[in-house]
Amino acid sequence: LRSLAKTNLPSGVPVKELHFQLSGNMNRYVWSINGRTLSETDRIMIREGQNVRIILTNNTMMRHPMHLHGHFFRLVNRHGDFSPLKFTVDIQPMATQVIEFNAAEKTRGNWFFHCHILYHMMSGMGRIFTYEDSPPNPQLPHPRQALQHVYAMDRKWYLTVNNDFASNGNIGDLEFGGTRWSIQGEWQTGYKETRGYEAEARLGRYIGEKQWLYPYIGMDWTYRKGEAGERNMFRQTTRKDRELDGTLGTRYTLPLLLVADARIDTDGKVRLQLERDDIPLTSRLRLSFSLNTDRDYSCLLYTSDAADE
C-alpha cells in the first residue's frame, strides 16, 4: 500500500519506542502481549506531542488484526514517506510490522489498543495508552472502578467438563480456571464394586509465556477391591484397595501435545505419567490414551460429531 500524500510524523519531538510480542496459548484460549494480559500490566503513559513507535512481532500461529482507538498510525513499509495511514493492521503469523503515530489527541485521556478478534481481546490481548496530565472525564465519575470493569474481561474463570459413558463405567475430566490458575479433576468409576474408582484433583498455576509448565498440589482417591499391596514400576507398594493421598507434582506439555506428569504423594510414592487427548485418526475418529508407572493404562476410541469440525 502507498499513500497519495506524505504521512511523515512531526520531526524534532521525543520518540517513545515499544516492542510488542503477540503471544498466547491456542489450546487454552489465552492471548496476551509480551506474555502478559491486559489486567496484568499497567497502562502505557504517553505525552501529548511525542511520536510513538510500536514494533509488533506475531509469535503465534494465528493472525491478529491490531486496532488503535482514537488515532491513525503510519503503517511503515517500503514506501517510506508515503507509508499509508491506518487504524487497524493485520499481523500475519511469524511476521513483524512497525507502526507509528503522533500523540496529538487534544482531549488526551485513555485509548485502547487491542486485537480485533473479539475473544482474543476479551482474553487479554490489549494495552491502554494514557496521556499524561489528562483532565478528568466527566462521563467516568469513578475511573478506578471503570478500569477494573475493563480488566474483568480477562480475569474470568470458565468451567469445562467431559464425561464418557462406557459399558463398564465412565471416564471424565473437568477444569475450572482462568488465565493462570486452574483447578483440574479426573475420574474413572466402574458400575460394579469390583471395578472400583479412581479420582484426582489438582490446583496449579500455568507458568511462562506459552504455559507449557503446570506445577500443582492435589489429592488422589483410589479404591479397587482385592488390589492391596500392588507394586509400581519403582517397586513401591501401592494400596489400591482404599487410599487417600496428597500429591505434589508438575505437568509439562511436550511436542505433539503429549502431556508428561511427574508427582510424589504423601506416602513417598513416585508416579510418572504420559497422556494425550483428542488424537485425530480420521476426520471423525479420535483417540485418547494414558499410561503411567503405577501400571495403569487407558485407551479411548471415539467419534466426533460435525459440530467439532
Language-model features: locations:
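Outer-membrane beta-barrel proteins
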Residues: 8, 42-44, 89, 151-153, ...
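Conserved small/polar residues in nucleotide/adenosyl-binding loops
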Residues: 302-309
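Solvent-exposed loop/turn segments connecting transmembrane beta-strands
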Residues: 162-171, 188-199, 209, 221-228, ...
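A structural motif
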Residues: 23, 249-252
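Copper-binding active sites and cupredoxin-like electron-transfer domains
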Residues: 1-159, 163, 169-171
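A generic beta-sheet turn/junction motif
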Residues: 24, 59, 165-167, 176-180, ...
